[in-house]
Swiss-Prot record:
It comes from Bacteroides fragilis (strain ATCC 25285 / DSM 2151 / CCUG 4856 / JCM 11019 / LMG 10263 / NCTC 9343 / Onslow / VPI 2553 / EN-2). GO terms for molecular function: rRNA binding; structural constituent of ribosome; tRNA binding. Belongs to the universal ribosomal protein uL1 family. Part of the 50S ribosomal subunit. PROSITE patterns: RIBOSOMAL_L1. This is Large ribosomal subunit protein uL1. The keyword Ribosomal protein applies. The gene is rplA. One of its GO terms (cellular component) is large ribosomal subunit. Binds directly to 23S rRNA. The L1 stalk is quite mobile in the ribosome, and is involved in E site tRNA release.
Amino acid sequence: MGKLTKNQKLAAGKIEAGKAYSLKEAASLVKEITFTKFDASLDIDVRLGVDPRKANQMVRGVVSLPHGTGKQVRVLVLCTPDAEAAAKEAGADYVGLDEYIEKIKGGWTDIDVIITMPSIMGKIGALGRVLGPRGLMPNPKSGTVTMDVAKAVREVKQGKIDFKVDKSGIVHTSIGKVSFTAEQIRDNAKEFISTLNKLKPTAAKGTYIKSIYLSSTMSAGIKIDPKSVEEI
């Protein structure tokens, strides 16, 4: 391992080994230990007491973060011509149908979210090999297959994100930027964890939220005491 930089040493000195911080403390601390020249993303990792291999213990959902994600989300709407104007007005970056389907078949995926209509899904099914591995396939459960594409665009632009537990039982997502205030970070984290609690599978036994870590793009993870989330 290479030598630590001056900033890395400063950051390491601020985190007490083995300590579980309150969410309030962690939201302030993550700003103190991030020294990037760019506006780093803030990530949260929550380990759940579930077995994702079992269908009745899969955790997947959507959450609208109170303060958004701070990211510019590029949205493609695949829709019928009568819905195009509303989608554009709502803020979609790309709107169309056949021309974008052909672009995607050719490997174009320079987007973050695809929103479409139920009547269009038949055409999109063939794109699964391109979109699936990148997590871009529209899904009714995440609200990206809908008759009201304009509403879906507004929600995504305002900070609605979808998430699911991975094979090792961890849910990972971004909840903002390091430029956010500590209060905004706390609000977003609390809303996300509250949503996870509501999605607890009835088949899950024992401790549900096993651990929570908050970090920025270039920082170490800060361990959070799950009990502290409800204290704010």
